[in-house]
């Protein structure tokens, strides 16, 4: 049984296709697209804001444990849905885990550096600095896969670099440690996206069905991250902190952490749903536009000190992200 059914509608081309001889139902399809897009935007924004709340407002100093708990929640839910027959996942064989382990190391590093950077940097600047990932990915595609980008893409990437540099210079709450973690996160995120496709192709060859759906990848990534996360948590001396902190004795804190785990899984589900109801181009553009309300919410909710120059740099970076998304659309078309 699948969670989402496909109605044979290609919204990217503006076409409505009949299903089984029935009359076209564009209103229903557009409502689904709107609902899935709204769910994706809410879950992705909420995830970052809740993580920021846990790390900064609660002053929780165990980012690796937070990631570990979130992934554990995801594993429990995915396994439960699979046992109920609501979703289909591939068996986690030893061969499959061996193939996936290298990319999982990058995945864990990506999550951990994101946690560490979010603790020290305000949400708006994190969203702008994440644009650097696009620059690294574009350069990586050019050198690794001989993929050429047109001038509009490079112009948008140049605008992203300017916005990131100017944003850092004008950031009133600048923190060098946080910026270092975020730059590391950009390199790891780009590495993950560059290696994921090849790893997926290899992994499909060792699965029982010859495929690897999104639910299987969520289960595979999160399951493999648990032992690695435990080792890193011990290496960073988080165990001593966890033993001493009074936060773990607060039911409200566990509720917030569990919510963050549910939101992490919700992003996976809603992104698949939204992508299924619309297409890659709309998904990419909405993802860029989604950073605008996220940045505003981050500044307002956490009382971030800002200046006109820094606000302008942030806005410039967000606009550059939208320009980049549109340039990529035209490049693909």
UniProtKB/Swiss-Prot annotation:
Observed effect of gene inactivation: Dwarf phenotype, necrotic lesions and a constitutive hypersensitive response to salicylic acid induction.
The answer on whether this UniProt entry bears the keyword Kinase reads: no
Sorted alphabetically, the Gene Ontology BP terms of this entry are: defense response; GDP-fucose transmembrane transport; GDP-mannose transmembrane transport
* Subcellular location, principal: Golgi
* Membrane disposition: Multi-pass membrane protein
Pfam families, A to Z: TPT (PF03151)
Q: Where is the chain membrane-spanning?
A: 33-55, 62-84, 99-121, 153-170, 174-196, 216-238, 253-275, 282-304, 308-325
Name a single GO cellular component. Answer: Golgi apparatus
Q: Tell me yes or no: is Signal among this UniProt entry's keywords.
A: no
Protein origin, superkingdom: Eukaryota
Output one GO MF annotation: GDP-fucose transmembrane transporter activity
Its keywords, alphabetically, are: Antiport, Golgi apparatus, Membrane, Sugar transport, Transmembrane, Transmembrane helix, Transport
Cellular localisation: Golgi apparatus membrane
According to its UniProt entry, the function of this protein is described as: Involved in the import of GDP-mannose from the cytoplasm into the Golgi lumen. Required for the luminal synthesis of a variety of plant cell surface components. Is required for the correct mannosylation of the glycosylinositol phosphoceramides (GIPC). Can indifferently transport GDP-mannose, GDP-Glucose, GDP-Fucose or GDP-Galactose in vitro.
Family per record: Belongs to the nucleotide-sugar transporter family. GDP-Mannose:GMP antiporter (GMA) (TC 2.A.7.13) subfamily.
Q: What is this protein called?
A: GDP-mannose transporter GONST1
Species: Arabidopsis thaliana
Provide the gene name from the record: GONST1
């Amino acid at each position: 049984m699948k969670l989402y059914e496909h109605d044979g509608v290609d919204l990217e081309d503006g076409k409505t296709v009949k299903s089984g001889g029935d009359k076209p139902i564009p209103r229903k399809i557009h409502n689904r697209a709107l609902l899935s897009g709204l769910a994706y935007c809410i879950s992705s924004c909420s995830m970052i804001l809740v993580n920021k709340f846990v790390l900064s407002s609660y002053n929780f100093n165990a980012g690796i444990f937070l990631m570990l708990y979130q992934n554990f929640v995801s594993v429990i839910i995915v396994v439960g849905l699979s046992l109920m027959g609501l979703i289909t996942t591939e068996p986690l064989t030893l061969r499959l885990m061996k193939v996936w382990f290298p990319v999982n190391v990058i995945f864990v590093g990506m999550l951990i550096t994101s946690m560490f950077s979010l603790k020290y940097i305000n949400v708006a600047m994190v969203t702008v600095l994440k644009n650097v990932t696009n620059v690294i990915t574009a350069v990586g595609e050019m050198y690794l896969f001989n993929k050429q980008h047109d001038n509009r893409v490079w112009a948008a990437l140049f605008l992203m670099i300017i916005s990131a540099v100017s944003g850092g210079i004008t950031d009133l709450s600048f923190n060098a440690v946080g910026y270092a973690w975020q730059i590391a996160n950009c390199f790891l995120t780009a590495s993950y996206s560059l290696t994921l496709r090849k790893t997926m192709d290899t992994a499909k060859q060792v699965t029982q069905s010859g495929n690897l759906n999104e639910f299987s990848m969520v289960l595979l990534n999160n399951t493999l991250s648990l032992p690695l996360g435990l080792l890193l948590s011990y290496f960073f001396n988080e165990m001593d902190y966890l033993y001493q902190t009074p936060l773990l004795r607060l039911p409200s804190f566990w509720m917030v952490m569990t919510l963050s785990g549910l939101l992490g899984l919700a992003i996976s589900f809603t992104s698949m749903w939204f992508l299924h109801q619309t297409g890659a181009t709309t998904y990419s553009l909405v993802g860029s536009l989604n950073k605008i309300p996220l940045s505003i919410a981050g500044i307002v909710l956490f009382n971030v000190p800002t200046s006109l120059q820094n606000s302008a740099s942030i806005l410039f970076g967000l606009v550059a992200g939208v320009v980049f998304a549109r340039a990529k659309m035209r490049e693909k078309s």
